[in-house]
Amino acid sequence: MVLIRVLANLLVLHLSYAQKSSELVIGGDECNINEHPFLALMYNSTSMKFHCSGTLLNEEWVLTAAHCDMENMQIYLGVHDKKNPNKDQQTRVPKEMFFCLSNKSYTPWDKDIMLIRLNSPVTYSTHIAPFSLPSSPPTVGSVCRIMGWGAITSPNETYPDVPHCANIEIYDYSVCRKAYGGLPEKSRTLCAGVLQGGIDTCLADSGGPLICNGQFQGIVAWGRHPCAQPQLPAFYTKVFDYSDWIQSIIAGNTAATCPS
């Protein structure tokens, strides 16, 4: 697992944060096959290893985490069981990728977001449909849905063929600051999980959606490994804060900048 830390507090943060780019939902159950038509599966076409998920915004655009950037990326839409493809499953590759910063810089609490333009539009179908951007931010205490093909056990990871889903809760950012230490006072992330432990996103869930009250509110970003430990919620990029940037890029303003 790749670990990324802030230079000023390198040792502490190196022990605290881990990308969820190879994680699945711990403590969940198989998602209903009709529950995730917007969910994208992201592979390295050379190694044929699954690394991340993403969310389809419209026929041409997928939103995911910046740390999901990889060589030889293939994006699968309409997938449920990886070993038994749906008839309407479609595959695309990136045509363009957009980051908040030209040097692709991001931290566990800022700008871990990537917008991908597909090489050709997908066709909507029974198992392929978009998810709109949120109209308002989520509130503390909201119950949210997580989903993905990431690890279902940790630290000895096992990976399912079908996506798993589970419910977690939004906490005040101060809960994550207390749990991890060394975090800035403000962040464009959501703090979410189950403080009792046992339920969490995990390796290879990165880039997937956090859905609160029917709205796409977060992107799976960072958390502690092993996954699903008590008192250690995870971080999700706050989609609402980046809505203007996302809409500007999709509209053709490729010079648009992310919120500071």
UniProtKB/Swiss-Prot annotation:
MF-aspect GO terms: serine-type endopeptidase activity; toxin activity
Residues bearing attached sugar chains per UniProt: 44, 103, 156
Gene3D superfamilies cross-referenced by the UniProt entry: Trypsin-like serine proteases
Subcellular location: Secreted
Matching SUPFAM superfamilies: Trypsin-like serine proteases
GO cellular component: extracellular region; secretory granule
Classification via InterPro entries: Peptidase_S1_PA, Peptidase_S1_PA_chymotrypsin, Peptidase_S1A, Trypsin_dom, TRYPSIN_HIS
CDD domains: Tryp_SPc
SMART domains: Tryp_SPc
Family note: Belongs to the peptidase S1 family. Snake venom subfamily.
Functional summary from the UniProt entry: Snake venom serine protease that may act in the hemostasis system of the prey.
Name of the protein: Serine protease VLSP-1
Organism from which the protein derives: Macrovipera lebetinus
Lineage: Eukaryota, Metazoa, Chordata, Craniata, Vertebrata
